[in-house]
């Protein structure tokens, strides 16, 4: 590049900075690469599967799955973790179904949670944009895309055909907010539902998500959550075993998976993950039904081991740090509490 070209380029950069703000156009070599900031999901295994220690800040996230698979529970845990780190969170409850009592049990500070229950889709997305523009909110959850009903559909008759209105609404909203999210360092999580494709034949998945294709493209991370087992204690169901697959990941390698327990009335079982990953990585020793850490036995069976870790948070944190170190993740990237529920005897060996 000759001197005239360099001067022209510098002038162009100055004009762009003046018009749109300093730092709008930069040379990558002029600025140190900053590690991705994250919000923990509340699940150690899922944070590891995401590759960066949690959900990336300033991005669009989609969490989808069948009914009662744990979608809302996962987002409530993310809210709780963001609040623990001093963040402000908002919950746009388009389904009008937020269980405040359950949110409290999971660890959400409901007194300081911003909640909106919009009447129609346009209102919900206007609220979303306004909240993001404020620059004061760290995490927004929209529950759910399927419930973002366009106003024209609400005002119309039952037999009116409104083809593609919701998809166009979502596409317009995402075009407007995606750039804002990065600028304001705010993360938005869209909860979505699954539908079956009509007339699907041949190869490919018969499932699809609602709201058109825009959300698939704009999302930096897409998580597919499925219930794979019901956890029982005797005859009583006390939780679900779920599997989360990272279907799309723009900040790390995709297609990794994590499994964990969601206990009714408690949420994600943290100490259960510590036992599982501890054994998998040879940090916790397992001999028969007994689990031990170092020279000390921590319990007979998985349930008793979880109770021990719950009662001894310093040991739990030590095991967690060793797991993170073994997996090559900086423990500062993942910050979460050690509160947890008792597990079930049905999972004991």
From Swiss-Prot:
A GO CC term attached to the entry: cytosol
This protein's record includes keyword Phosphoprotein: no
GO biological process, one term: DNA recombination
Pfam families: RecA, RecA_C
Cellular compartments annotated: Cytoplasm
SMART domains per record: AAA
GO MF term set: ATP binding; ATP hydrolysis activity; ATP-dependent DNA damage sensor activity; damaged DNA binding; single-stranded DNA binding
Keyword Zinc: no
InterPro entries, per the entry: AAA+_ATPase, DNA_recomb/repair_RecA, DNA_recomb/repair_RecA_CS, P-loop_NTPase, RecA-like_C, RecA-like_N, RecA_ATP-bd, RecA_C_sf
Gene3D superfamilies the UniProt entry points to: P-loop containing nucleotide triphosphate hydrolases
Disulfide bond sites: none
Residue positions binding ATP: 65-72
UniProtKB keywords: ATP-binding, Cytoplasm, DNA damage, DNA recombination, DNA repair, DNA-binding, Nucleotide-binding, SOS response
Chief place where the protein resides: cytoplasm
Role this protein plays: Can catalyze the hydrolysis of ATP in the presence of single-stranded DNA, the ATP-dependent uptake of single-stranded DNA by duplex DNA, and the ATP-dependent hybridization of homologous single-stranded DNAs. It interacts with LexA causing its activation and leading to its autocatalytic cleavage.
Protein family (similarity comment): Belongs to the RecA family.
Official protein name in the record: Protein RecA
Lineage: Bacteria, Pseudomonadati, Campylobacterota, Epsilonproteobacteria, Campylobacterales
